[in-house]
Amino acid sequence: MTVLLFGFEPFLEYKENPSQLIVEALNRSTILKEEVKGVILPVEYKKIEDVIVTKIRETKPILTLGIGLAPGRAKITPEKIAINYRYSREGDNAGKKYRGEKIDPLGQDGIFTNIPVEDLVDLLNENGIPAELSLSAGSYLCNNAMYIIIREARKYNSLGGFIHVPLHESYAARIQRSIPSMSLDTMIRGIKLSIEFILTNKNKKENLTLS
């Protein structure tokens, strides 16, 4: 089976995106005997749906996890819900803006992840990785991707979710901005631990069902 990881290319004034670096670091690794496949998404509304839908259909992963940058957040923040809504004052990398349109005209207004994010937050904090539950993935590309990930994962009875990360320390230092950040190594460790926890939790539930 496969774990499918999505990260994003740089966007707006951020010339490096830690989500891309995290996904590239974990790509082709093996976590609890599951192969990790990493894909970098374009920061373009018109392209991400086709990429996500195609990759999930091709790989039929046991878990699909999106990773995105949340400038201004100081902790790793697993997301609880994606909303069927697009609103962006800033355009995407192609200049496209939305002013309140739905992601999926026929879809639900909101979709909850089927990942136990509350327990995941506890696990990360217990392992010395600052984490906090988030109840809003925003209305930009990350929320857009999360909505599609969860919607598509449900079609295959698999797991789907999204985790936001802070800016990485090395880049924050280079641009000399006073902005919350975290070391890239800590974030990579946090995402790897997250995958391990999610897979272990899934296996426990399956074993309980069988017994």
UniProtKB/Swiss-Prot annotation:
SUPFAM superfamilies: Pyrrolidone carboxyl peptidase (pyroglutamate aminopeptidase). The keyword Protease applies. Its main location: cytoplasm. One of its GO terms (cellular component) is cytosol. It catalyses: Release of an N-terminal pyroglutamyl group from a polypeptide, the second amino acid generally not being Pro. One of its GO terms (biological process) is proteolysis. It is found in: Cytoplasm. Belongs to the peptidase C15 family. Homotetramer. This is Pyrrolidone-carboxylate peptidase 1. It comes from Saccharolobus solfataricus (strain ATCC 35092 / DSM 1617 / JCM 11322 / P2).
